[in-house]
């Protein structure tokens, strides 16, 4: 009782934002160590308590073998998700899914259709700050991952073409399908995100000359079937979702409980495609699922030897980065990070700056900001509080004034919205 609350407040984050599975550091600050008993004493004390159990037991609190203390419900959510991810990365289970998938796909037309939906070399690029490397077309590789894997995570910053890649991969999947039209569900965490996903997918289909290939996008809650007054959904292990492919956009906003319930509702033969940016829009509730799946910024696009060979054979992409690790995570072949930005030039000032910020390269950030070569960005010293409104007015008001004038003139609504979204 003497220590009740203090170490838990220090060691366990109430609302973890990221790295929720990170182990505690070996060396703790002395100020914390002085107020905490040894870890072994904590474990013994907790396990002696009737409300604390170990994984597999049904008790209010669960203490795992890495000394992480969970509410049972959240341990169960995490366990469900971990089991699903491991099954997707398990070689035997992955091969079973692949064989079932291949029976329903006519792969003889893969090469021709891949070039149709992903024009040759359109996605290859070099970075100005690393001209020695030519990067492959990650969109093509993501499309191949969608064909071969049950779970695929397509990550990337805004403008890298995540939605376009998903739409083209789905179109490719549909063209290669031997059976009836694929049943595809589109979902997002919020209603607004679902509307934008709908617009983006239809626009992407139109660019490759295809009609609408799926129904309306919906929220994840609506997809699962909300039950009034209940934390459970209509769809679950005993009543799986009736879809062949499920695409979830803005997946970084999906929290741990909702993601666990989503994977529980998948049928054994269905594919799950998660789209999102690990550096943006974290979930409000506990559990940074997408961020934990993607790992650190430099951990993406490292594949197994078998998948690397398949990429070369099926797509012709050979400029793959060397794998710096001896052992890769089981789901590494399911994780594709898009890097080429179609919203702005990767070698522009904003392109170089965004990469430096994501890498945490402080020196490079200030070098770019102070460079006279980057005309699209400017370094502004923050004025005193009284001067801040004037600085904002000088830089922003004229844009808003033009927008308001378009509204007053009753211009075409599409033109107004396009201008407002710039």
Q: Which sequence ranges carry the predicted segments?
A:
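Conserved helicase motor core of P-loop NTPases
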Residues: 116, 279, 283-422
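Short basic/glycine-enriched coil/helix segment immediately N-terminal to the Walker B
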Residues: 212, 229-244, 254-255, 260-270, ...
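Conserved lysine of the Walker
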Residues: 162
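Inter-Walker segment of RecA-like/P-loop motor cores
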Residues: 184-244
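N-terminal pre-P-loop "Q-motif" helix
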Residues: 131-148
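Interdomain "pre-motor" coupling segment immediately N-terminal to P-loop NTPase/helicase cores
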Residues: 31-112
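Walker B catalytic acidic pair
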Residues: 249-250, 276
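Hydrophobic positions on the alpha1 helix immediately C-terminal to the Walker A/P-loop
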Residues: 165, 169
């Amino acid at each position: 009782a003497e220590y009740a609350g203090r170490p838990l407040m220090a060691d366990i984050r109430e609302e973890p934002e990221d790295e929720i599975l990170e182990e505690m550091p070996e060396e703790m600050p002395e100020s914390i160590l002085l107020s905490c008993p040894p870890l072994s004493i904590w474990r013994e004390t907790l396990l002696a308590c009737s409300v604390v159990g170990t994984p597999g037991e049904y008790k209010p609190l669960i203490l795992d073998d890495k000394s992480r203390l969970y509410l049972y419900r959240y341990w169960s959510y995490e366990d469900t998700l971990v089991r699903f991810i491991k099954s997707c990365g398990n070689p035997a289970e992955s091969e079973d899914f692949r064989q079932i998938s291949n029976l329903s796909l006519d792969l003889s037309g893969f090469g021709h259709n891949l070039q149709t939906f992903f024009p040759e070399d359109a996605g290859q690029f070099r970075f100005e700050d690393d001209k020695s490397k030519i990067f492959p077309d990650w969109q093509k590789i993501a499309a191949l991952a969608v064909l071969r894997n049950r779970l695929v995570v397509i990550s990337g910053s805004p403008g890298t073409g995540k939605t376009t890649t998903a739409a083209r991969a789905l179109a490719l999947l549909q063209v290669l399908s031997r059976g009836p039209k694929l049943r595809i569900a589109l979902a997002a965490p919020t209603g607004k995100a679902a509307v934008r996903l709908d617009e983006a997918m239809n626009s992407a289909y139109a660019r490759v000359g295809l009609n609408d290939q799926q129904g309306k996008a919906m929220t994840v809650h609506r997809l699962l079937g909300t039950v009034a007054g209940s934390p459970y959904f209509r769809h679950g292990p005993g009543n799986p979702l009736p879809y062949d492919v499920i695409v979830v956009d803005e997946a970084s906003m999906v929290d741990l409980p909702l993601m666990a319930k989503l994977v529980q509702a998948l049928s054994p033969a269905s594919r799950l495609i998660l789209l999102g940016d690990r550096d943006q829009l974290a979930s409000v509730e506990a559990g940074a699922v997408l961020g934990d799946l993607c790992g650190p910024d430099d951990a993406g696009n490292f594949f197994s030897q078998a998948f690397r060979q398949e990429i070369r054979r099926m797509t012709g992409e050979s400029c793959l980065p060397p794998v710096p690790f001896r052992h890769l995570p089981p789901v590494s072949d399911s994780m594709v990070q898009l890097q080429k930005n179609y919203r702005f030039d990767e070698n522009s000032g904003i392109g170089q700056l965004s990469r430096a910020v994501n890498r945490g390269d402080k020196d490079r950030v200030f070098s770019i900001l102070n460079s006279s070569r980057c005309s699209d960005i400017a370094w502004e010293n923050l004025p005193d509080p009284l001067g801040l409104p004037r600085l904002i007015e000088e830089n922003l008001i004229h844009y808003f004034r033009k927008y308001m004038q378009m509204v007053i003139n009753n211009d075409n609504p599409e033109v107004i919205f396009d201008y407002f979204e710039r």
